[in-house]
């Protein structure tokens, strides 16, 4: 629930209604994170653009499902339950394997990277995301070299 005023789908008009129509789900549901932009629809356009280009662009080399894993992980580190739920929904949809998705979520909930049903390369990316999220000043050349050696590129 937002602490600022938002405009619900049924009360939206003009450009906001057009934007809502592009992103609404079943029963005209608009995600809360998007409704936060309802007083400034131009910021919703920017939000959608950056999200699409960062997580869902066709030129990305990291699989979309794994980008959602990173989203769940970073959201957990940031204690953002709403974001965890959002990224976990995307993970389940993109992965298409609810058992594996649930196992990933269980490991993340315990903050147990070792137990995650992921490759060593993916676990390295999880560790890298943690450093960037919690202590970016502790990023080292060794960590970057390890990422490159594992197959990640700039």
Please provide the spans of the model-predicted regions.
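Acidic/His metal-coordination segments adjacent to aromatic residues that form catalytic metal sites
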Residues: 107-119
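Acidic interhelical loop/turn segments
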Residues: 138-154
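Short, thiol/selenol-centered motifs that function as redox-active sites or metal-ligating centers
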Residues: 70-94, 136
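Amphipathic, charged-and-aliphatic alpha-helical interface segments
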Residues: 71-72, 120-141
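Mobile cap/lid helix-loop segments that border enzyme active or cofactor-binding sites
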Residues: 1-64, 99-102
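Alpha-helical scaffold segments that form or flank carboxylate-/histidine-based iron centers
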Residues: 32-39, 64-80, 154
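Ferredoxin-type iron-sulfur electron-transfer modules in oxidoreductases and energy-metabolism complexes
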Residues: 100-110, 150
């Amino acid at each position: 629930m937002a602490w600022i005023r938002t405009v619900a789908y049924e009360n939206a008009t003009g450009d906001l209604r057009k934007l809502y129509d592009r992103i609404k789900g079943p029963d005209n549901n608009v995600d809360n994170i998007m409704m936060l932009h309802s007083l400034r629809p131009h910021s919703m356009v920017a939000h959608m653009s950056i999200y699409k280009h960062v997580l869902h662009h066709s030129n990305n080399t990291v699989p979309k499902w794994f980008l959602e894993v990173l989203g769940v992980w970073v959201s957990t580190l940031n204690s953002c339950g709403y974001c965890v739920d959002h990224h976990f929904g995307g993970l389940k949809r993109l992965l298409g394997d609810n058992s594996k998705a649930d196992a990933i979520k269980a490991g993340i909930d315990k903050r147990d990277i070792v137990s995650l049903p992921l490759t060593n390369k993916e676990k390295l990316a999880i560790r890298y995301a943690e450093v960037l999220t919690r202590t970016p000043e502790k990023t080292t050349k060794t960590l970057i070299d390890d990422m490159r050696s594992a197959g990640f590129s700039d």
